[in-house]
Amino acid sequence: MTTVHDLSSDTMTTAADRAARAIPPVWPLASSVAVNPFLGQTEEHLAQVSARLGRIGNVPVTMPPAHYAALIEDGTITDDDIASASAASRIDNAPDLAEIKRSAAVPFDRPEPHSTIADLAARMSGIDWPGILADRFGHWASGFFDQGQALWAAPRRRGAYDAWRQTATHDLTPEITGLTGFAQFVSETPDTAQEARLRAAKRLGLDDDMLETYLHQLLFSLGGWAQVARYHLWQAELSQTTDETIADLLTIRLLWEEALFLQYEDRIGDRWEATKTAHAQPVTPQRGEIINAILQEAWEHAVQRDLASTIAAPSPERGEDRPTLQAAFCIDVRSEVFRRALEAVNPGIQTLGFAGFFGLTASHKSFASDVDELRLPVLLNAGVTSTSTGENVTAEQTARFKARAKRAWGRFKLAAVSSFAFVEATGPIYAGKLVRDALNIGSDPHDYGPAPVLDPPLPLDAQIDAAETILRAMSLTTDFAPLVVLAGHGANVVNNPFASGLHCGACGGYAGDVNARLLAALLNTPDVRAGLADRGIDVPSDTLFLGALHDTTTDAITLFAKDHPSAAHDAGIAQAETWFAQAGTVTRAERALRLPRADGDADVDLRSRDWAETRPEWALAGCKAFIAAPRHRTAGKSLAGRAFLHDYDWKKDSDFSVLELIMTAPVVVASWISLQYYGSTVAPDVFGSGNKLLHNVTGGIGVVEGNGGTLRAGLPWQSVHEGEGYAHDPLRLSVCIEAPREAMTDILRRHDGVRALFDNRWLHLFALDASGQMAWRYTGDLEWSEMARDARISDDLDAAG
C-alpha cells in the first residue's frame, strides 16, 4: 500500500521549478548555439554531479578509468599532477596516490540509476513502457514544438498540457500495447497542470525529500524535448516574463507514471516504496566517483603544465611602426590558426581577438525577409535593430515573390494528395538540379545582400557611446592602421542540419558578417570619430574600417569593400586580399593535418560542398584554453587552434569594467562551448545527438535518430570522434587572464554564478604575471596559490635562450 503524504501545492510548484532549472536549454537548429549540459549543476563539484546524474540516469561525467590509466602509463599524467589534483579536491579523507593509481587500473562499476514507475512496470510486465512512452511523447511533441516543417500547425494557444490532453484522449496506442483505459484516464485528469501534478504526486505518495531528484529524473528522461521547453522558459525570462511549457511537460510525464502505477500497483508497490526511500537519501558520491574526478583534474593539470610552457616561450620582438593592417577576429579557437598564419605573412600585420558579435547586440532582418535574427549572445537581449533592405525596392519585392513561390512549391511537393504524384511526374526534371548542386553551378553562396543599417538609427550620442565602449573593450584606442578589418565568421556547408552550430556562437548561431559591417559603418561615420576624439580616442583620418567574413570551413576571407568605397584605399585593400589568400592557404594546410581523409589544403575546400561529408570542419573540437592578454603574449606561438584569444590590456582598463565584461560574458560563453564538447565526449549517449547518418530533422527544431522518439541535443558523434579516436580531449577550460588578482577576486565576489564555475572547477582560472607567465592559480573561495615553476618550463626556456 502506497504511503500518502500531505504534499502542499506550493511545495510541489517549488520542486517542479527546481527540476526545470536542472535541465539545460537547447536552441532550434536555425540558430543553434553551444549549451553547457551541466548548466543546472554548476553549484556542485564534479564528483557530486556524477552521483546526482548517476542516480537519475547512470550518466558518466568523466572518461572511464582506463583512459586515465593510459595517460599515467605514457607519462602524460605524473604523480605530482595526481597529488596536486587530490589536494585541490578539498575532500576529507581524500584517497592517497597509491589508491588512486590502483583504482585507475580497474573498471569502475557505476551504481544502477533509481527506477521510474515506467521502469518497474516494464520489468514486471515485459512491456517496454519507457520505450513506448518515449515514442508516444515524441510523436506528440514533434508536432507541438514544430517551427514550420509540418504542413498543419498543432494547436498551442492553451499550452502544452491542454494540447497533449486533446491528443492523448484519441491516441489508442498505449491501450493497444497494454495500458488499459489510458485515454479515459487522461480525459479525467484535472483541467490545470498544477492540479494534475499535485494529484499525481499524492497518488504516488511523493514526499518533500524525494522530489528533488525524482522530478529531475522525469524531465531528464524526456531528453531534448525537456530542453526545448527549457529554452522557452529561458527566452521568456530574458523578456521579464515566464513560460509554463516545461512545467506542463513534467506534468505529462508524471501522469504517465500515475497511469502505470494505477495498473501495476499490486505488483510494484514494494519496489516503489524502496525507490522512494532511495530518492530521499542525500546525494553522496562514491569512492570511485571521487577518484575519477581527481584523475580528470590531474589530466587537466598536465595539460595546463604544457600550456604554461607554451605561453612562457619567448615572443617575437614587437615593431614600433604603425601597423600596415589590423584585422580583428572572433575569439573563436578557429581564428587562432588563421591569425597566426596572417601575422606570419607580413610582420606589419597586427591581429586582435574580440567577441564575434563586435559589441552590437542586433536583432536583424535580412534582405527580403521579415524574420528577426537575434545576432547576439544568448545571455543578452537585443540592443539595436537592423535591416539589409537596401535601396533597390524592386529587387527586394522580386526576391520576396520568389521566396513565396518557393515556399508554396515546397508545400505542394509535401502535401498528402500531391506528394506521390509529384515524384512520379517531375522526378526526372530534378536530375539537372542534382548535377548543378553537386558541382556548385549556378548558385552564389557568397551573396550576403546589401550593407546592413541600423533601423531606426541610434542618436549620435548613443553611437559615440557604443563606439567608445567597443573600442575600449577591444583595447584598440591608439595606433590605428590605415586599414582595419573587422572579420566576423561563419561556415559554408551543404546538407548539414547542424550548419548554424558552425557559425558564430556569440552571434546566436548566425554568421558574424552583419555585426562586423554594422560596426565598420559606425566607426567610419565622421561625427562619431569627432565624438571619439573628444573622449581621447583619436582615429586617424586615413583609417578605413571594413567589415569582413571569415569562412571557417574554407578559410576564405570576404571583404565588404563596396560598403565603403575609397579610392585612396584600393591598393591597400587589394594587398590585404592577397595576404588573406596566402594566410588561408597556410591555414588550410594546417587544418588538413587534423581532418580525416584530407591530403592538403585543396581537400579542405571540397569538403564544404560534399553532401556526404559528416566532418566538413572540426569547429571548436579540441578547445582547452581561454587567454585574455595583449596579443604579444601569444604571438608566434602555436596554440594549435585550441585556444580562445581575447585581446585585453588591463593597464588601459582603469576601472576594470572591461575585465568584468570579459569574465561575465565571453568567458561564460566559452565555458558553454567547452562543456558541450566535454559532455558530448564523456557521455555521448546522453549529452550528444548521436550518429549523423541516422538523423532526421523533426519540426525544424532538432534531430531524432530514426523515425521518432527522443529529441537528441548536443553534438553529433562525428563532431568529437574522427572514426578511430577522439578528436576532442574532454578538458574543462583553463582561463588565463593578465590582470591583477585583486581585480579578478572582486569580480568573482560580485558575481555568484561566475564564481561557482571556478569554485566548483567547471573552469580553471589563472593569473598571468607581468612577464606574461601563468603565475597564480585560483583555488576557490576567493583564494589563490602561487604556481611552482615547473622544471620542464625552465628547461624549455633555457633551451630557447
Curated annotation (Swiss-Prot):
Signal peptide: none annotated. It comes from the Bacteria. Zn(2+) binds at residues 330, 332, 489, 504. It is found in: Cell inner membrane. Its cofactor is Zn(2+). GO terms for molecular function: zinc ion binding. InterPro entries: DabA (IPR018752). Pfam families: DabA (PF10070). Keywords: Cell inner membrane, Cell membrane, Membrane, Metal-binding, Transport, Zinc. It is a peripheral membrane protein. GO terms for cellular component: plasma membrane. The keyword Cell membrane applies. The keyword Membrane applies. Part of an energy-coupled inorganic carbon pump. Forms a complex with DabB. Belongs to the inorganic carbon transporter (TC 9.A.2) DabA family. This is Probable inorganic carbon transporter subunit DabA. It comes from Jannaschia sp. (strain CCS1).
